[in-house]
Amino acid sequence: MKISKGKYKMKIWNSGKSTAYNVDFKVPEECKGMVLKQKVPYEFLETGKSFEEIVLVYYGTPDKFKVTTTWSNKEGHEYSKEQIVSI
């Protein structure tokens, strides 16, 4: 989602059936300066809810990159999901 010239938002949401805890994400080393991690770890994310982080786009920014989202359930079991984000 574009919010201004060179500035986008990446949305992280819970499409599961239960609350996710300690939600965080990782990006490749070469993309770390692009994605601002201002809200993570997100303490809990209820079903159907989301939050956004700012993505800075500049000359030389990759058209797409991998994001690995991590979270745990109420019992503390950890989960992760890899996705491709395209700009």
Per-region residue spans from a language model:
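Amphipathic alpha-helical "stem/stalk" segments
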Residues: 1-87
